[in-house]
């Protein structure tokens, strides 16, 4: 059974990501890969980490052994209609890939204009690059994840900063095999990146670095701004360059040179006088959500306020979950979905935005306030800050459950005196 000594755990805690860099530089065997995966596991999960065994890596990296056991398939609805097929790894493989994904992100810095699945970048930072422009030009890359085969992934791992070349080339192939899967693509079987594997987005950022560099150079040449969020590429400019034959031909040439294909059906030129959208956000003047997004939040909060939680939850399950299809049948899905939508709204509009603040106050009234949050602020920032936070929501009762199952009901007087 694989274990770390107390001294080794202390070293992992002290060095963290630096230890991953050190260990990857000297990677020479499958046992070395196992060690670095387990280091990542400890960094990610601490005391809860369950260390991998070499047999796990060998099994899941060998398609002959594990092809039928690696992935399960499901579909999700697209906003534009139709369905998207997702190939998701089984739990054991998912754990391995999450650790390798962390390792890849430690070792590799994506291009500055790669905005998807990168720490401290998001759909918001992507959209911000294209605000208040006369023209916004969107293109989509066809069958994006499935365009990257195992050999291409192996090649990338042989380059800087991974350098698994020469005598270490078999390790590059082994890791590439771990991250790819045999899928039927347009009538033929190919070993490619699955859409649903934790490593696939990061690996596409690695593999698309030359594409990002060339397209960013093209944008600069024509006085435009470029960015890419996964398969969604955006150019924006105040000049009318997007009907320029030289620009369009060079764009197509660069994409084809990287063995990728533009999905012509999804190419859009958006002018200032009409609504301009980038990665699901409006960018005409500033980054904003669709009106429908806020309208839907208000609707569900209104249902809670008017009909009560039980009926509102029933309406939510009937309509929203039916629409999305892939949402899990959780104990309280409405609360989780509304929380997620509010966090997204906060990310887009900012924590001080009036619309966000009003909606979050209604949410707190509807679901009850987080007593632990108040008490933490009370301890760290004083009673006045805690009272101010409480007064924004004004729930009827504040309930905190202890380990024995008993609860304490705090009134407004308890908090403010």
Label every model-predicted segment.
Residues 80:
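ATP-binding glycine-rich loop module of kinase domains
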Residues 231-237:
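Short beta-strand->loop micro-motif that forms the acidic, two-metal-ion catalytic signature
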Residues 141, 230-231:
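Short acidic donor-binding/metal-coordinating loop in glycosyltransferase active sites
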Residues 1-76, 86-139, 144-165, 169-170, ...:
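Right-hand nucleic-acid polymerase module
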Residues 225-228:
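Short beta-strand
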């Amino acid at each position: 059974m694989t274990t770390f000594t107390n001294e080794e755990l202390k070293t992992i805690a002290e060095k963290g990501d630096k230890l991953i860099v050190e260990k990857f530089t000297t990677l020479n065997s499958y046992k070395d890969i196992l060690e670095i995966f387990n280091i990542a596991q400890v960094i990610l999960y601490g005391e809860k980490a369950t260390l991998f065994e070499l047999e796990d890596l060998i099994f899941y990296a060998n398609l002959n052994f594990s092809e039928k056991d690696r992935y399960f398939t499901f579909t999700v609805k697209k906003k534009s209609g139709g369905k998207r097929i997702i190939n998701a790894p089984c739990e054991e493989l998912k754990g391995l890939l999450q650790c390798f994904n962390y390792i890849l992100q430690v070792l590799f810095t994506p291009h500055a204009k790669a905005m998807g699945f990168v720490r401290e970048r998001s759909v918001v930072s992507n959209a911000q690059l294209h605000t208040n422009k006369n023209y916004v030009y969107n293109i989509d890359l066809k069958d994006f994840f499935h365009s990257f085969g195992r050999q291409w992934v192996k090649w990338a791992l042989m380059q800087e900063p991974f350098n698994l070349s020469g005598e270490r080339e078999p390790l590059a192939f082994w890791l590439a095999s771990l991250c790819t899967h045999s899928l039927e693509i347009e009538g033929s079987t190919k070993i490619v990146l699955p859409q649903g594997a934790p490593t696939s987005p990061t690996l596409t950022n690695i593999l698309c670095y030359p594409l990002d560099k060339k397209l960013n150079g093209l944008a600069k040449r024509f006085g435009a701004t470029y960015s890419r969020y996964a398969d969604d590429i955006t150019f924006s400019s105040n000049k009318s360059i997007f009907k320029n034959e030289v620009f369009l031909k060079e764009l197509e040439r660069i994409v084809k040179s990287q063995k990728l294909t533009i999905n012509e059906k999804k190419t859009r030129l958006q002018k200032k006088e009409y609504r301009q959208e980038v990665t699901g956000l409006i960018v005409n003047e500033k980054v904003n959500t669709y009106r429908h997004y806020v309208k839907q939040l208000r609707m569900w909060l209104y249902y809670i306020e008017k009909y009560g939680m039980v009926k509102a939850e029933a309406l939510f399950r009937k309509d929203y979950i039916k629409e999305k299809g892939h949402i899990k049948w959780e104990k309280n899905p409405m609360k989780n979905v509304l929380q997620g939508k509010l966090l997204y709204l906060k990310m887009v509009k900012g924590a001080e935005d009036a619309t966000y603040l009003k909606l979050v106050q209604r949410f707190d009234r509807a679901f009850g306030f987080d007593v632990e949050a108040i008490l933490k602020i009370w301890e760290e920032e004083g009673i006045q800050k805690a009272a101010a936070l409480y007064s924004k929501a004004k729930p009827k009762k504040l309930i905190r459950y202890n380990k024995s199952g008993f609860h304490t009901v705090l009134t407004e007087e308890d908090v403010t005196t």
